[in-house]
Each structure stands twice: as structure tokens, then as C-alpha cells.
A protein has these predicted regions:
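Positively charged n-region of N-terminal signal peptides that target proteins for export
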Residues: 1-6
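Hydrophobic membrane-insertion alpha-helices, especially the h-region
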Residues: 12-13
Length: 305
């Protein structure tokens, strides 16, 4: 009889102790996760590392995500990043945590639940529990975020964020056919199509006649983080090669390889992707919700001599 009582006491005590341990771990983990994800101002969505066949729409649009006091923010544009919403972007929903679970409620895309795996001090993987997809996020503070990295790692998207690029300066070099190109356009319909125009400078962007069409390629350069090689392949068979650098968030420099001419292009009509109605941008803008990021694999080549 004593043995039975003792066994029951041990069993009950073990269950009670186990329950307490599990409950404490969940509470501690939940608090830690909430504290951890809000300890970084920005989480850069390293979309090129995404794995799986599923998709979370708001993460496919965002360059950065932020979690602050239950509100979720996103930067869906490269242009004006660091300015909109004091660097956090726009409010896009809310979130909560428990254990290792992150629950998000996006204003447009609805409810998603993620399991969060910490990979390093400032890097996490979030796994969608309802579909086969994982996203990789890297944490930064706004005052230490590498905006140059953002521009150059996502240069194709930056080129798409204006309805057109107007040539505003030309210096040096030998005369060449590209001197006649006054406007360029890179569409968000895919990541390879461009258009060009000989229309006079100052033409309203909605009335530009796009004379030529083709495909473009961006290549990484070994040892150069702030330089890309841009190739324009015209459908008529012509090819133009450039050294591409970003001057600021609305200006690019194209150095023509064969003629050594340097062209400056400025963006016209900034396209806001899923922005709030009231934003801090001073750029003339149109709004669009049609763009999602895709995984871009670039060739890396030696620097030209």
C-alpha cells in the first residue's frame, strides 16, 4: 500500500513538475522572441535565399520588415527608404508572439503563422507553418543599415521604381549611336525587359514613344560592391555595354564601355509599391501593387581592365 501511494505521489509530482517546466519555457521563449525581433529597427528580407515552393505575398514585396510594439512595418520601395516612416516604412499590419511562433496579420494579405529559428545574433529564418516556404531575415539598426548594399543587391528593382529614366547629362567619350537615346524604361512585368526612346528631352512621360525594345543583363563585378555591369541587348541585334553606378536614390551613372562616354540618367515619376496614402516623399509618384520580388541569379565577372 505504501509503495502504491509513493508511486502515485512520484507520478503526480513528475507530471506537475513537467507541466511547470513546459509552461515556463513557453512564456520565457515568447517574451524573448518578442523582445528579440523588436530589438532591431529593420529586418532585411534576403529574398534571394528564399527556399520552398510557397509564397507569403507581403514578404515577397518587402525589402525590410520591422516589428515595434505590436505593429508591423514594411519598406516596399528602395527609393526613399530611410525616409518613409522614419526609416521603418509604412504600417502594414500587426503581430504577436508565443514560444517560437510569430503570428502576423497583414492589412491586405491576412493571417500568417511562422516558426522562428535564430541562425546568428542578427539573423533568423522564418518558416511558414501552412505552406512550404522559408524566408531569411537579417537584423539592422537604422543608423547602421547599409543602404548601398540594398541598392546594389536589388538594382533591378531600383531601376523599375520610376516610370522612365531621362538622360540629364553627357560627358566625354566619342560619338556613338547611344547618344540618341534620351529615355530608358525598365518594367516590373519581368526582370529582363527594357525600352528606349529618342523623343525630345522634356516629353511628358505618359506620351513617350518607345522606339526600341530589348532585354538587359546585370552582372556582379569581382571585388566591387558599388559597381555593376549593365548590358542592353536590343531586339534589332545591337548591344550596348555600361559600367552602372548609383549616384543617389533617383540618379544613375552609365559609363559606355566602347566610347568611354558617361551618361547621367534621372528617374521620372517614382512608382510607390503598396504605400500608404500619406507619405513623406517629395517625388512625383504613382501607386502600384503589382510588383513582387523574384530570385535573381547574377553572373559574377572579373573587373574590366
Amino acid at each position: 500500500m505504501k509503495r502504491i501511494k509513493l508511486l502515485l505521489i512520484l507520478l503526480i509530482g513528475g507530471v506537475t513538475l513537467t507541466s511547470c517546466v513546459v509552461r515556463n519555457e513557453i512564456v520565457d521563449d515568447g517574451f524573448s522572441l518578442n523582445e528579440y525581433i523588436s530589438s532591431y529597427d529593420l529586418w532585411y528580407v534576403d529574398y534571394h535565399r528564399t527556399t520552398g515552393s510557397g509564397e507569403v505575398p507581403f514578404l515577397s514585396r518587402a525589402f525590410t520588415i520591422s516589428f515595434l510594439n505590436g505593429t508591423m512595418y514594411a519598406n516596399n520601395n528602395i527609393v526613399d527608404i530611410g525616409k518613409t516612416g522614419n526609416g521603418l516604412g509604412i504600417a502594414v499590419g500587426n503581430y504577436s508572439t508565443y514560444g517560437t511562433i510569430l503570428e502576423t496579420r497583414h492589412d491586405i494579405d491576412g493571417y500568417f503563422e511562422f516558426d522562428v529559428v535564430q541562425l546568428s545574433n542578427n539573423e533568423i529564418r522564418i518558416d511558414d507553418l501552412s505552406q512550404n516556404v522559408s524566408y531569411y531575415l537579417v537584423g539592422y539598426q537604422t543608423d547602421t543599415f547599409d543602404y548601398n548594399m540594398l541598392f546594389y543587391e536589388n538594382i533591378e528593382y531600383f531601376l523599375q521604381e520610376f516610370k522612365a529614366w531621362e538622360r540629364t547629362d553627357e560627358t566625354g567619350g566619342a560619338p556613338n549611336p547611344f547618344d540618341n537615346e534620351h529615355y530608358l524604361k525598365f518594367t516590373h512585368k519581368n526582370d529582363v525587359t527594357f525600352y528606349s526612346s529618342h523623343d525630345p528631352f522634356g516629353t511628358n512621360v505618359d506620351y513617350i514613344n518607345w522606339d526600341f525594345e530589348g532585354s538587359y543583363i546585370v552582372r556582379n563585378v569581382i571585388g566591387e560592391n558599388n559597381l555593376k555591369y549593365l548590358t542592353l541587348n536590343y531586339d534589332n541585334g545591337d548591344t550596348e555595354e555600361f559600367d552602372l553606378t548609383v549616384i543617389n536614390d533617383e540618379t544613375i551613372r552609365l559609363k559606355h564601355v566602347s566610347s568611354r562616354t558617361t551618361y547621367i540618367f534621372s528617374g521620372i515619376e517614382f512608382i510607390q509599391y503598396l504605400k500608404a496614402e500619406k507619405t513623406n516623399t517629395t517625388k512625383p509618384a504613382v501607386r502600384s501593387s503589382g510588383r513582387k520580388r523574384t530570385k535573381i541569379k547574377r553572373e559574377t565577372v572579373p573587373k574590366r581592365k
